[in-house]
Swiss-Prot record:
Listed name of the protein: F-box/LRR-repeat protein 17
Keywords carried by this UniProt record: Cytoplasm, Neurogenesis, Nucleus, Ubl conjugation pathway
Pfam families: F-box-like, LRR_6
Quaternary context: Part of the SCF (SKP1-CUL1-F-box) E3 ubiquitin-protein ligase complex SCF(FBXL17). Interacts with BTB domain-containing proteins; specifically recognizes and binds a conserved degron of non-consecutive residues present at the interface of BTB dimers of aberrant composition.
Tissues in which the protein is found: Expressed in the neuro-ectoderm of embryos.
Length: 673
């Protein structure tokens, strides 16, 4: 037959992966030919075609450029008359990953079949040894540029022009597993040494093969050359040990027709010793390649995936898939921060089981869980001594027993938010003040039995407090305010909405140099002078809420605008102010971003226009039920100052509808009349 260069394309020459009569090359398709991963005679593996069809990347009388379709050709992702699109199964064809009667799923090998890189009579496998098969050549053959025969009719090959491929002192071997046909361009690649290509044409076309790009990772199969973690090609022998590693980065395409050629190229790196990449490989080396099941992933990786699920998704969906997933969903790391709020099915027994499975719970929220009793909370306190945050709003069935248990067994408690619990009294607060020295954040809104007695104990015992919020606690007076101002100098957030405090107690808050947020809503005996003094003394104040205080007037707001240099939020709903207050804010304040003057009956169009025009910092202006502000004026301001959000009934409705449309909501079509 004569000598054949590896990339020659004459009829009686043999190139790796080239197809001639009675020979089968990977990715080639002729009548009675079998492409890699294909099964019985007359069947077609993925990316292959049947009689009269051409598989992409195949060589023969009808070479096909990848992704291009012409007469008698098949583009990999296009199907026309007499053509086969990949992953499509027709008569006498096999869809990948599907096996039926007379069909073979990919990666399976049987009689008259060829596994990738395997050897059989009359077949060409690039890295296997058998009759009529191809082996790689050594550098000593480089001068001759031919294919020489070895014992038992074996053939060795190499590219006739390798002068540019290897340093003078190195031995070089190159096995090209994707080149076939009469005319072809060399694929792109990046190697761990000087640039390598397969012909002079390639050197002219692509002078620099090294490019950059994100690394790509795929799985590895024994005996196959695959793209491995880290952006390298690795050839694996039967023992699943890497024999050849070639650095690879995603490369720029050589041409549009060979865009993805680099991922089918196999080039061993330079080596001073005899390479071992293809030693002892045979058809028995390769077992069937099974797709990786998700449960074969390391448990640590599955836990990381499950951490992105919500509690409902883990408990209701993922845990029902299989026992393994259920066990993973019960891992203690998922039970540190529990939000069980508004779940009526949560009862004491469920709470006890959760606490028994994970004693690492640090946060728990049982708001609106009306079936949880003091007993369930006591079990949590006993079994979870590391509890840091406890939230229980509107659990009217709970009493002092719950908080006393938490105070006794959870010394690290830092946050306690308990609201609207009629049974809670000073007894629980006294125990917390004596035991919970790390307490930093407490909310006791609408707990009507709490008085100064319990709060003073907390103020004296929990001097690390940073936030305190009381709401409608009529038994809380100026004494509590004085105690917190004296014993808790680190307070940053203070709220006494609707409590029985007066200006006499509030003035003590000027001692809090770190105060940043102050909520004084609905304090009937609050005068303007007290508010102005607090703003002057507390230079770090960023939020001030004075809603529902009819005593606050324009003069007070003017001083706030001048002195509150750090102030960003000012709430004045239902205060006794006029347009002058808005004009003063726009004129004097360079920091205020949010102003709400809803239900202020004396605010008119003029005030709204002036603050929008003069203020450089304003971003939100609340005008809800300011009846003297014309909606047409607001619409004009919206168009003129798009960086400001104007809040009125109509504007809020428009924004709500707009968000609904963005989320895919459509109004019901009116019935035909």
């Amino acid at each position: 037959m004569g000598h054949v260069a590896p990339h020659a394309s004459k009829k009686e020459h043999v190139a790796p992966h080239a197809a001639e009569k009675d020979h089968v090359a990977p990715h080639a398709s002729k009548k009675e030919h079998v492409a890699p991963h294909a099964a019985e005679k007359g069947q077609v593996a993925p990316y292959a075609a049947g009689e009269g069809q051409v598989a992409p990347n195949a060589a023969g009388e009808r070479p096909v450029a990848p992704y291009a379709a012409g007469e008698g050709q098949v583009a990999p992702y296009a199907a026309g008359e007499g053509q086969v699109a990949p992953y499509a199964a027709g008569e006498g064809q096999v869809a990948p990953y599907a096996a039926g009667e007379g069909q073979v799923a990919p990666y399976a090998a049987g009689e008259a079949q060829v596994a990738p890189h395997a050897a059989g009579e009359g077949r060409v496998a690039p890295h296997a040894a058998g009759d009529g098969q191809v082996e790689h050549c050594t550098v000593e053959d480089r001068e001759e540029g031919h294919i020489g025969t070895t014992e038992q009719g074996h053939m060795s090959h190499y590219t006739s022009k390798l002068e540019h491929m290897a340093p003078p002192s190195a031995q070089t071997e190159a096995v090209v597993s994707y080149v076939a046909g009469e005319r072809h361009a060399p694929p792109d690649c990046t190697v761990s040494g000087p640039a390598m290509c397969c012909s002079a044409e390639a050197r002219q076309t692509t002078p620099d093969w090294t490019t950059t790009g994100p690394e790509i990772s795929q799985g590895t199969l024994p005996g196959l050359t695959v793209l491995h973690v880290g952006g390298t090609w690795q050839t694996f022998a039967a023992e699943d040990e890497p024999c050849v590693t070639t650095l690879l980065s995603p490369v720029k395409p050589l041409s549009s027709s060979r865009k993805y050629a680099p991922y089918n190229l196999q080039i061993p790196s330079y080596s001073e010793s005899e390479p071992q990449a293809h030693k002892g490989l045979s058809s028995e080396t390769f077992g069937p390649c099974e797709p990786l099941h998700i449960n074969q992933l390391p448990s640590s990786l599955l836990l990381k995936i499950f951490s992105n699920l919500s509690l409902n998704e883990r408990c209701i969906l993922a845990s029902l898939v299989c026992k393994y997933w259920r066990d993973l969903c019960l891992d203690s790391q998922f039970w540190k921060q529990l939000d069980l709020s508004n779940r009526q099915q949560i009862k004491d027994n469920i709470l006890e089981e959760i606490a028994s499975r994970s004693q690492n719970i640090t946060e728990i929220n049982i708001s609106d869980c009306f079936s949880v009793s003091d007993q369930g909370v006591c079990v949590v306190a006993l079994k979870c001594p590391g509890l840091v945050k406890y939230t229980a709003y509107r659990c009217k069935q709970l009493s002092d027993i719950s908080l006393i248990a938490l105070a006794a067994h959870c010394p690290s408690l830092q946050k306690v938010h308990v609201g609207n619990q009629d049974k809670l009294s000073d007894e629980a607060l006294i125990q917390m003040g004596r035991r919970c020295k790390e307490l930093k954040d407490i909310h006791f809104g609408q707990c009507y039995k709490i008085s100064d007695e319990g709060l003073i104990v907390i103020a004296k015992g929990c001097q690390k407090l940073q936030k305190i919020y009381m709401q409608e606690n009529k038994l809380v007076s100026d004494e509590s305010v004085k105690a917190f101002a004296e014993h808790c100098p680190g307070l940053q957030y203070v709220g006494f909405m609707g409590c029985s405090v007066t200006s006499e107690g509030v003035i003590n808050l000027t001692k809090l140099k770190h105060l940043s947020s102050l909520d004084l809503r609905h304090i009937t005996e609050l005068d303007n002078e007290t508010v102005m003094e607090i703003v002057k003394q507390c230079q770090h104040l960023t939020s001030l809420n004075l809603c529902l205080n009819r005593s606050i007037n324009d003069r007070c707001v003017e001083v706030i605008a001048k002195e509150g240099r750090s102030l960003k939020e000012l709430y004045l709903v239902t205060c006794k102010i006029t347009d002058y207050a808005l004009i003063a804010i726009g004129r004097y304040s360079k920091s205020i971003e949010t102003v709400d003057v809803g239900w202020c009956k004396e605010i008119t169009d003029y005030g709204a226009k002036q603050i929008a025009q003069s203020s450089k910092s304003i971003r939100y202006l609340g005008l809800m039920r300011c009846d003297k502000v014309n909606e047409a004026t607001v619409e004009q301001l919206v168009q003129q100052y798009p960086h400001i959000t104007f809040s009125t009934v109509l504007q809020d409705c428009k924004r709500t509808l707009e968000r609904a449309y963005q989320m895919g909501w459509t109004p019901n079509a009116s019935p035909a009349t």
